[in-house]
Amino acid sequence: MPSMDIVSEVNEVELRNAVDNTRRELDSRFDFRGVESEVSYKDHQVTLSSESDFQCQQMVDMLRNQLSKRNVDPASMDVAEKAIHSGKTFSLKVTFKEGIDSLVAKKLVKLIKDSKLKVQAAIQGDSIRVTGKKRDDLQAVMAIARESDLGQPFQFNNFRD
């Protein structure tokens, strides 16, 4: 029986490349000349710091743009609500969602079961295993997962016939 896993992962190499490209763009942009701004990456967390809150928001847009160029879904970004002000700099933390938490997994399994396809979906830690009799059913599940608006991008791996 064909099976596959639904996961939510961020390619760390592409994420680091996007952060480096954002840093390069920051150095070359005219509106950031003479402004102390910094982009740093550590443990799936990007820290954007600049002299004003508005510039931090511009840096978030620059990072989103670079992520989409590197084929990393910007929907996996979790931007802090407010920039932290300390001294003369504002810092904004951006974390990236890894794995499917249990609430989202339950909603996705419910969507799959409500579709009346002949597949079984089982939650396995931070991924969902889907098995079915036909490959077409699994492809329909892939379409359902892509169309679902659960605030998280999904990838599909371990596709077995």
UniProtKB/Swiss-Prot annotation:
Which SUPFAM superfamilies does the protein's record reference? YajQ-like
Q: Which UniProt keywords apply?
A: Nucleotide-binding
Disulphide bonds annotated for this chain are none
A GO CC annotation given for this chain = cytosol
- Any GO molecular function: nucleotide binding
CDD domains xref list: YajQ_like
One of this protein's Pfam families, by short name? Answer: DUF520
Signal peptide positions are none
Q: Which domain of life does the UniProt lineage start with? A: Bacteria
- Can you tell me where the transmembrane regions are? none
Q: Which family does it belong to?
A: Belongs to the YajQ family.
Q: What does this protein do?
A: Nucleotide-binding protein.
Q: What name has this protein been given in UniProt?
A: Nucleotide-binding protein Shew_2893
